[in-house]
Amino acid sequence: MKVAIAICRNIWYSEALSEMNTQILVSILGLAILAALSSGAKAAEPELAVEVSELLKAMEHAPQPQERECRWFWGACKSDSDCCRYLGCKRKWPNICLWSPWG
């Protein structure tokens, strides 16, 4: 163990390698900081998902899929009236709602 420490000390203090060693040390410390920050963010991620889902459930006027009066972009349709404003029903197969200059 003492030999390994002595070798590391000799490499670290050599003048030719001191600048490179500093850069390597800074890089390793930077990666360690990024790893710590990302692990903290991953730990908080499930809490955020729960909070967002609770907020959506608490909204009284949350949009529900069955309340839609029109079909959105790429939705299946039979006529232009099925599609939302500025969308028109494509005349050929597949019949889907697309952007329409006349809609």
From Swiss-Prot:
Pfam families: Toxin_12. Transmembrane segments: none annotated. Disulfide bonds join 70-84, 77-89, 83-97. Residues 44-68 form a propeptide. The keyword DNA repair does not apply. It is found in: Secreted. Residues 1-43 form the signal peptide. InterPro entries: Huwentoxin-1. GO terms for molecular function: ion channel inhibitor activity; toxin activity. Keywords: Disulfide bond, Ion channel impairing toxin, Knottin, Secreted, Signal, Toxin. Its main location: secreted. GO terms for cellular component: extracellular region. Expressed by the venom gland. Probable ion channel inhibitor. The presence of a 'disulfide through disulfide knot' structurally defines this protein as a knottin. Belongs to the neurotoxin 10 (Hwtx-1) family. 45 (Jztx-60) subfamily. This is U28-theraphotoxin-Cg1a. It comes from Chilobrachys guangxiensis (Chinese earth tiger tarantula).
